[in-house]
Amino acid sequence: MDMKKTLIALFAALMLPVATFADKYTGLWKEYDEAVKKDLPKSQINVLERIAASAAKEKSYGNLLKAEVRRINTLASISADSIPGAIRMFEAQAANAGNSDKALAAVYNCVLADVYEKVEWKSNTFPNAGQTAKDYARKALAHPEVLAAKNTGGYVPFVKEGTDSRIFNNDLLSVVGYTLKEYRRLNDYYNKTGNRT
């Protein structure tokens, strides 16, 4: 009986950090949502910076990316003048991730490709946005084998599971490829490797 109690206590102790992890982010995202409801952009940015700092330290990439993208959106809603600086910071983080985690760098590059594609027609601030978007898209898909081997679970809540996710074994390649509308490239890769279920 003592062995059973010991095992239960050990299991509970091992699960505690996971529960605390989830509760911390859930609490921070609720705090952020409250700041949004009250239209308090400075408070939103403060919470997002705390989420990003904690997530970077703990390698909770889904929370990190979600916080960083929301931060850029919040800064943009305050002042369009802050967009270039926020994007440059995001670019630096993408470059930094490229040195340590190719999958994380690919997601950063995918987001940057999407951002530059959307600003191309709206802004004189980014005169080469179209080409820059293509460059980031190319970087995002530079290592398809790494993305195909990486499950999207580590990128929640930034990435949400879709209805077709299981067809691609919930891999990151399908998310990046579909976001960038690289359907033919995905099809060619999956036909060659047989990664689809």
Spans of features found by a protein language model:
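Positively charged n-region of N-terminal signal peptides that target proteins for export
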Residues: 1-6
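General helical structural elements
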Residues: 8-9, 75
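Bacterial N-terminal signal peptides
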Residues: 9-17
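Charged, amphipathic alpha-helical interaction segments
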Residues: 17-18, 118
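Boundary at the C-terminal end of the N-terminal hydrophobic targeting segment
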Residues: 20-22
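Extracytoplasmic/secretory-pathway proteins
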Residues: 24-197
